[in-house]
């Protein structure tokens, strides 16, 4: 085989069958809502392309995005970095350190000029020349510009990289900004979340590997496959919202019955993400299923929107009177339905208490 094997050849060397490649492509295609023909093209692309060189840069971040990626179930982290991409630089996962690590980064960029993908997690410090966050004596802002210059594309993983995140919270002492504010001449895709869902990261990278292009994006540069609907759209508690049945606190009867968490601050109606469908840890659960409202962590400025437990209102950006009115109307209808139900029950009980044969 060639010294620079295709991904298909590489997988054969590792004992993977064509069936396994097709199964993985079908899974990723389903996650991204691709039509059957595109899933076949995805499988062909994965088999015929070469392993994608990835330079992963970590700036002002908490390593939560990497933590999330380690919990990817399809593909697993080891499948992703050994079979599908060549992770040539990642501070947390690489064996090398110090100058050896920086040499590896520069060598990978030179060997794959114009073909490597830069993944960034963490916001970028720009104040005072970016001195508040440096790696090997290099300011994050300078390292990003140098890496992005010859990249195929840039993927901003996590809300910090996508929108500035918590480091950009007022008063933003480090001048933290999103990757897209600095990289203006390369394709940029945002995969927000604090942290993002692992399969959204892995699926986007797999699409890049197979097609050499970004998936369809929304106005905030997020893949529509994962951020095309609000959490509210797919939430299993949505029927309770429609009926006006809400938890008023985290330990009241409504909470115990699994009612809608809108009144305790859930931001699901204005948050675009696939938490309610993909869920976390291999589809085990997501925050609302675990009893806590959505914080809106995949939306810009969620960190400066006031209390997490304050109900959405018309005074908040992104929500108008229609949605707030719907909640009020839902509550009114739900209350009316409950009143009618109680009235019907009382009438039934009164009838049951009458002596047999009493028609009065």
Name these PLM-found stretches.
Residues 1-17, 359:
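N-terminal secretory signal peptides
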């Amino acid at each position: 085989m060639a010294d620079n094997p295709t991904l298909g050849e590489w997988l054969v060397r590792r004992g993977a069958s064509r069936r396994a490649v097709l199964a993985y492509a079908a899974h990723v295609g389903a996650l991204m809502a691709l039509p059957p023909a595109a899933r076949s093209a995805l499988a062909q692309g994965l088999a015929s392309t070469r392993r994608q060189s990835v330079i992963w840069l970590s700036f002002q971040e908490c390593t939560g995005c990497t933590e999330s990626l380690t919990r990817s179930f399809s593909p697993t982290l080891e499948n992703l970095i050994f079979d599908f991409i060549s992770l040539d630089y990642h501070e947390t996962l690489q064996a090398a350190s110090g100058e050896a690590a920086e040499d590896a980064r520069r060598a990978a960029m030179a060997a794959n000029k114009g073909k490597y993908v830069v993944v960034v997690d963490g916001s970028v410090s720009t104040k005072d020349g970016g001195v508040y966050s440096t790696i090997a004596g290099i300011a994050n802002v300078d390292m990003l510009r140098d890496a992005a210059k010859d990249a195929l594309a840039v993927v901003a993983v996590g809300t910090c990289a996508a929108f500035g995140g918590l480091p950009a919270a007022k008063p933003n002492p480090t001048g933290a900004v999103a990757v897209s504010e600095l990289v203006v001449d390369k394709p940029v895709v945002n995969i927000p979340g604090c942290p993002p869902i692992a399969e959204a990261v892995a699926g986007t990278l797999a699409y890049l590997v197979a097609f050499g292009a970004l998936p369809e994006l929304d106005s905030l540069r997020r893949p529509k496959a994962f951020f095309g609907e609000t959490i509210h759209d797919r939430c299993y508690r949505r029927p309770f919202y429609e009926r006006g049945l809400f938890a008023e606190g985290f330990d009241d009867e409504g909470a115990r019955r699994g009612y809608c968490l809108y009144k305790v601050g859930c931001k699901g109606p204005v948050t675009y993400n696939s938490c309610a469908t993909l869920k976390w840890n291999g589809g085990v659960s997501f925050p609302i299923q675990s009893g806590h409202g959505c914080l809106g962590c995949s939306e810009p400025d969620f960190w400066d929107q006031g209390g997490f437990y304050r109900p959405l209102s018309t005074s908040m950006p992104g929500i108008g009177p229609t949605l707030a009115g719907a909640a009020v109307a839902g509550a009114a209808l739900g209350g009316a339905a409950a009143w009618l139900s109680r009235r019907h029950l009382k009438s039934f009980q009164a009838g049951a208490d009458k002596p047999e044969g009493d028609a009065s």
